[in-house]
């Protein structure tokens, strides 16, 4: 597996740097050691993303010629910039193991973004008009959280892979905006964890849907939707009884999902693409 191999590689090298407080120069040297391997894995992930896009496009539109597009390779400048959030932990004396984990997750996320970027770029670059009917979020089941499960349950309702930088559907944004009392600072705080659709460690993919009745992950989405409906009923009952922490049905439904997951009532792997 591409990311599993990379995670082990990064942990081995980064663990050598947890004792001293890293200077900027030492941090850059560590990144220089890691970069060739991350770049290689990035290329592999980009190729897989492209193969997936080509196979789905060919399946639903065999009459169309291949959409030629150059592969996007990881650039050093991107890598340094995207690893910056992980630098602080390793810049402390006696850095905790959590700092190594954070760097590992950051590199894994960068590689997983390669396939996502390749698919999104191929769709944007496609000369055939309107062959993509929508976008759907799907999971592999390794690191899916309750928030991700909510997005998966929506199916191919997303009109674009990126909506103004805020990767949430309109209904959720409206709920969060109202919950914040239309206060911009509160709204920013509510949406801060979701400004990027894929958090570190997230294994979700966003896929183009060429046929709304036949797309990878449809069966898992239908299972997720039923779970969301059931959790919504629980949330409504709690709100009506006054036992809920808030009156926001969307938020309380997510909380209900988290409780069910904690109790072991379902496994995230049941809602994965390959389930």
UniProtKB/Swiss-Prot annotation:
Superkingdom field: Viruses
Gene designation per UniProt: 15
Designated name of the protein: Gene 15 protein
Organism this protein belongs to: Mycobacterium phage D29
Pfam families to which the protein is assigned, alphabetical: VG15
Source lineage: Viruses, Duplodnaviria, Heunggongvirae, Uroviricota, Caudoviricetes
């Amino acid at each position: 597996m591409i990311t599993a191999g990379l995670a082990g590689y990064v942990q081995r090298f980064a663990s050598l740097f947890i004792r001293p407080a890293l200077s900027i120069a030492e941090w850059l040297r560590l990144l220089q050691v890691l970069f060739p391997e991350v770049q290689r894995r990035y290329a592999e992930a980009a190729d897989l993303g492209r193969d997936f896009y080509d196979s789905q496009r060919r399946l639903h539109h065999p009459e169309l010629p291949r959409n030629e597009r150059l592969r996007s390779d990881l650039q050093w400048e991107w890598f340094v910039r995207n690893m910056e959030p992980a630098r602080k932990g390793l810049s402390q004396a006696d850095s905790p193991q959590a700092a190594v984990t954070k760097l590992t997750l950051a590199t894994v996320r960068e590689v997983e973004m390669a396939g996502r970027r390749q698919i999104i770029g191929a769709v944007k670059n496609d000369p055939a008009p309107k062959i993509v009917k929508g976008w759907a979020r799907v999971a592999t089941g390794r690191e899916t959280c309750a928030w991700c499960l909510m997005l998966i349950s929506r199916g191919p309702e997303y009109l674009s892979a990126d909506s103004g930088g805020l990767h949430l559907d309109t209904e959720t944004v409206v709920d969060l905006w109202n919950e914040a009392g239309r206060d911009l600072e509160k709204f920013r705080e509510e949406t801060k964890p979701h400004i990027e659709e894929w958090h570190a460690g997230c294994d979700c993919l966003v896929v183009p849907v060429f046929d709304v009745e036949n797309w990878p992950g449809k069966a898992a989405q239908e299972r997720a939707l039923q779970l969301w409906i059931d959790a919504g009923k629980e949330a409504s009952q709690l709100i009506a009884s006054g036992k809920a922490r808030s009156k926001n049905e969307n938020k309380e439904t997510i909380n209900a999902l988290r409780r069910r997951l904690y109790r072991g009532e379902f496994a995230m792997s049941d809602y994965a693409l390959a389930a």
